[in-house]
Design a protein with these regions (language model features):
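Conserved PLP phosphate-binding loop immediately N-terminal to the Schiff-base lysine helix
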Residues: 1-11
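Conserved core segment of the aminotransferase class I/II
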Residues: 17, 21-86
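Short hydrophobic/aromatic beta-strand micro-patches
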Residues: 41, 120-122, 162-164
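Conserved glycine-rich beta-strand-loop-beta hairpin in the small C-terminal domain of fold type I
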Residues: 86-97, 108-122
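Short, conserved charged micro-motifs
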Residues: 126-132, 169-173
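PLP-dependent enzyme catalytic core of the Aspartate aminotransferase-like
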Residues: 138, 154-184
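Residue-level detector of anion-binding/catalytic polar loops
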Residues: 142
Length: 184
């Protein structure tokens, strides 16, 4: 939903007709976590999934809120909000990447995301992203170490940086502090 360069990749479900594929989604990025609304798309297991939800004594959510969200989407406001969010993210990420390019030195490199707000930075051989992230927390610098995103705890020399902030003096100072942390 948050792709701003090129078109969004198709979900795995588009590449096969397997009944084993289930697609989950939510409105978290537009509505926030308080609403807890999302969707599930599956080919042959939807009744079983709904039954399991009831068995686990979970509710299906607030019906008035669901109706309001359906009206919001039917009126095209969801798509309009997504377009606005994509433009804001593209601008913020581009500005953040320019700053990142200024503060990072070898052996660090990064890749520009095609959507979302995270930028992946690659450290040199032997760089321990988890150790640096832990040290950064003590200084108020938040990095997402690569092993957090790997089931095999790989990507030890990668970390993610959130570039979604409006780029004023404070975030720029944070990146400069991050650079100092990386060169220690």
């Amino acid at each position: 939903d948050l792709t701003y360069r090129g078109s969004a990749p198709a979900p795995l479900m588009a590449y096969g007709d397997s009944d084993q594929i289930t697609l989950f989604g939510s409105f978290l990025h537009v509505l926030g976590p308080d609403f807890g609304l999302g969707w599930v798309v599956t080919r042959n297991r939807s009744e079983a999934m709904i039954a399991a939800k009831f068995r686990n004594n979970l509710t299906l959510g607030d019906s008035a809120l669901q109706r309001a969200l359906a009206d919001y989407m039917a009126a095209g406001r969801y798509e309009r909000e997504l377009r606005h969010l994509r433009r804001r993210l593209a601008t913020a990420v581009e500005s953040g990447a320019k700053l990142l390019q200024q503060v990072l030195s070898r052996p660090f490199s990064f890749s520009m995301p095609a959507g979302g707000y995270m930028c992946w930075v690659r450290g040199g051989h032997g760089f321990d992203a988890a150790h640096v992230a832990h040290s950064g927390l003590k200084r108020g610098i938040v990095l997402a170490p690569g092993p957090m995103f790997s089931p095999s705890e790989g990507f030890h020399n990668f970390f993610g940086v959130n570039l979604s902030a409006p780029w004023g003096q404070y975030p720029a100072n944070q990146l400069a502090r991050m650079s100092e942390l990386l060169t220690r």
